């Protein structure tokens, strides 16, 4: 799981930093983006996801808030927010309730520009095909399975970041 986590996180960090460097007008905190991108999936080891060598007891959808808890204990509250808010295009309180997700009842959508950038960059990489950057079309197809709101958010990020 460690090698998968680090490889995936490096891909996300590199994509996010490349976007940040291409958009100096956004004044993105690149040091924070690098750190938070490297830590955004720290909670995966607590989940039951054998395909990525994780044998914990929680459903995979919980990895964001579980990672957030780890980083809060380490006194990294801003990094913790990235963990909690990066899944998909973020998860709203309404989605948590409607889909009966096993998550704390609070909004988990990215707010800061840095949170949004890491969430966006994360969409381009899976943990099962580490070397492959996903196409925009593939990402749209994956997001459509969850909600049309996710696709709309993704398109807004494409306009902002690409």
Regions found by a protein language model. Name each.
Residues 9-13, 64:
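Short alpha-helical patches at coil-to-helix transitions and adjacent helical residues
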Residues 146-162:
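Charged phosphate-binding loop/patch that engages nucleotide di/tri-phosphates or the phosphate backbone
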Residues 25-137:
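Divalent metal-dependent catalytic cores for phosphoryl transfer on phosphate-bearing substrates
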Residues 2-8:
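A short, charge-rich alpha-helical start-of-domain segment used by transcription regulators
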Residues 138-145:
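A hydrophobic, small-residue-rich beta->alpha segment in the mid-to-C-terminal subdomain
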